[in-house]
């Protein structure tokens, strides 16, 4: 049908929207490659004991750099050793905060993406969000010329606020402007742009490009470029016709927007679909967070939804994304940053592969397959690190295990939770459930970002045995508690949840979605 095609305006609009997703991915990955350079700068600015030459070796001090190095003139060897240890702990803490502050911002903002989109409209909300992206980029871009640790932590926090908003706004906008039969395919471009941003940040972070003493601050501030480009292009994008029709009740503007997006005057199907959606939505009330846990019809679905997101984050995947360079270094790889880029490339490739598999294999099946694969990869990852001193070839075992770990993650546990949470709930409770799921996802992201380095320091090469145990627990939970949602109506899914929880059917049925497929998770 004419309306179910990708027009020039639709392609332009989707490209513009996913520039926000690209920034999201760039901000996730950018902190990884220049880790050693930034840590050296932290030590240089904060002051390090003179016998710890690792912090200042080959560091080119220019007129703007004022070293605050403490001299050991009147200290005993024991006191000096304590001071050195204390300095190392402070630097480790500041680096962990530099990584995890991004998740704090995302955690705070994740609840407000939908609210901002309803308040300002989808286009204006994305424009407003970009002010946060530009502010964060400016703070980080200037970090070399001030208190670097404070500016980077502040900049990462503000960028996290932006990403928390955009993680809700972009999928929502794309889902609302896409034709029904293309909604799933276009919706996955959010995730694809995100992992592309991660890969580009890793390439730009190579030492001979921007990940060096001279340009690392430019690398951190470079997200301003797609932010400015998106601000410019958004001025030429049509507002969401669903927002105009369902929220503002402006049918004339909604029709005008639809005609631009569809490239045709015949928009009857879309208007009728929105009219039906409006009638159905009016019969079903919204649900609060408390009701999700107190109402027996929602309690088990929300618990399962949250557990899926916990499984995604506590699998250890973000430990790899945030700290992959140091992990490869520990594994004995001579050029760890190139291996990290390999992880980013595999991440992008298998995100695309998952799109082709999800409707054929089913959500639960792919999630289980991914978790089982990640369990074995985590075991071999740790075995490779533990036995590295005895067998140098074990470094290749660890590296291969990391690549496969990321592949299995993107096949199932990466994208699947977002599909399934949307399918567990009908129109009334769905916005609240998705907001709560996003919040829990960011909270777990923050915990891993903050704690992984400490856990890795404590457990050493055994760290991924811990994550293997966690993955095994979530795999068993998925096997016994998570239903398959592919091809099932909401009534069928709700009935299965009621059977598992032993609750009675609801006294009064509400209007539900007739069929739940991947193209309908908006």
Swiss-Prot record:
InterPro entries: Glc_transpt_2, GLUT, MFS_dom, MFS_sugar_transport-like, MFS_trans_sf, Sugar/inositol_transpt, Sugar_transporter_CS. It catalyses: D-glucose(out) = D-glucose(in); D-fructose(out) = D-fructose(in); L-dehydroascorbate(out) = L-dehydroascorbate(in); D-galactose(in) = D-galactose(out). Keywords: Cell membrane, Glycoprotein, Membrane, Phosphoprotein, Sugar transport, Transmembrane, Transmembrane helix, Transport. Present in liver, intestine, kidney and beta-pancreatic islet cells. Glycans are attached at residue 62. PROSITE patterns: MFS, SUGAR_TRANSPORT_1, SUGAR_TRANSPORT_2. N-glycosylated; required for stability and retention at the cell surface of pancreatic beta cells. It is a multi-pass membrane protein. Residues 1-10, 118-125, 178-185, 237-301, 359-365, 423-431, 481-522 are cytoplasmic. D-glucose and maltose competitively inhibit fructose transport. D-glucose, D-fructose and maltose inhibit deoxyglucose transport. The chain crosses the membrane at residues 11-31, 97-117, 126-146, 157-177, 186-206, 216-236, 302-322, 338-358, 366-386, 402-422, 432-452, 460-480. Signal peptide: none annotated. One of its GO terms (cellular component) is apical plasma membrane. Facilitative hexose transporter that mediates the transport of glucose, fructose and galactose. Likely mediates the bidirectional transfer of glucose across the plasma membrane of hepatocytes and is responsible for uptake of glucose by the beta cells; may comprise part of the glucose-sensing mechanism of the beta cell. May also participate with the Na(+)/glucose cotransporter in the transcellular transport of glucose in the small intestine and kidney. Also able to mediate the transport of dehydroascorbate. This is Solute carrier family 2, facilitated glucose transporter member 2. The gene is Slc2a2.
């Amino acid at each position: 049908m004419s309306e179910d095609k990708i027009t020039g305006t639709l392609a332009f609009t989707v490209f513009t929207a996913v520039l926000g997703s690209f920034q999201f991915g760039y901000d996730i990955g950018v902190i990884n490659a220049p880790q050693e350079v930034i840590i050296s700068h932290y030590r240089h600015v904060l002051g390090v004991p003179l016998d710890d030459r690792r912090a200042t070796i080959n560091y080119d001090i220019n007129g703007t750099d004022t070293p605050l190095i403490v001299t050991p003139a009147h200290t005993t060897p024991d006191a000096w050793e304590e001071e050195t240890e204390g300095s190392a702990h402070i630097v480790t803490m500041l680096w962990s905060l530099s990584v995890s502050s991004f998740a704090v911002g995302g955690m705070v903002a994740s609840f407000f993406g939908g609210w901002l989109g309803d308040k300002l409209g989808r286009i204006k909300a994305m424009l407003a969000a970009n002010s946060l992206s530009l502010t964060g980029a400016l703070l980080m871009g200037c970090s070399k010329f001030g208190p670097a640790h404070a500016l980077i932590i502040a900049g990462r926090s503000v960028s996290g606020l932006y990403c928390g908003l955009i993680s809700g706004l972009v999928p929502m906008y794309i889902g609302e402007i896409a034709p029904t039969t293309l909604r799933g395919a276009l919706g996955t471009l959010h995730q694809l742009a995100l992992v592309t941003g991660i890969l580009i940040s890793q390439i730009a972070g190579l030492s001979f490009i921007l990940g060096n003493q001279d340009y690392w601050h430019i690398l951190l501030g470079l997200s301003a470029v797609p932010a400015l480009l998106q601000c410019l292009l958004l001025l030429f994008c049509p507002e969401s016709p669903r927002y105009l029709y369902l929220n503002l009740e402006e049918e004339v503007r909604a029709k005008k927007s639809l005609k631009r997006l569809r490239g045709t005057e015949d928009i009857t199907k879309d208007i009728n679909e929105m009219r039906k959606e409006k009638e159905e939505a009016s019969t079903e009330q919204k649900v609060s967070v408390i009701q999700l846990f107190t109402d027996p019809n929602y309690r088990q679905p929300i618990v399962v939804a949250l557990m899926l997101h916990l499984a995604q984050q506590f699998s250890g995947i973000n430990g790899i994304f945030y700290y992959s360079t140091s992990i490869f270094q520990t594994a004995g790889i001579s050029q760890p940053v190139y291996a990290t880029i390999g992880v980013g490339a595999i991440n992008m490739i298998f995100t695309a592969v998952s799109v082709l598999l999800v409707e054929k294999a089913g959500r639960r099946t792919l999630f289980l397959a991914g978790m089982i694969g990640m369990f074995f990869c985590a075991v071999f990852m740790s075995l490779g690190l533990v036995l590295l001193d005895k067998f140098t070839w074990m470094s290749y075992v660890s590296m291969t295990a990391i690549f496969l770990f990321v592949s299995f993650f993107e096949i199932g546990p990466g994208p699947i939770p977002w599909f399934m949470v949307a399918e567990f709930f009908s129109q009334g409770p769905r916005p609240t459930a998705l907001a709560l799921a996003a919040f829990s996802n960011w909270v777990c992201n923050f915990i891993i970002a903050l704690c992984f380095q400490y856990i890795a320091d404590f457990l050493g090469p055994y760290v991924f045995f811990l994550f293997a145990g966690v993955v095994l627990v979530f795999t068993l939970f998925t096997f016994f508690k998570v239903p398959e949602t592919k091809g099932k109506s909401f009534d069928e899914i709700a009935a299965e949840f009621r059977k598992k929880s032993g609750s009675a059917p609801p006294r009064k049925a509400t209007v539900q979605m007739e069929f739940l497929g991947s193209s309908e998770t908006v």
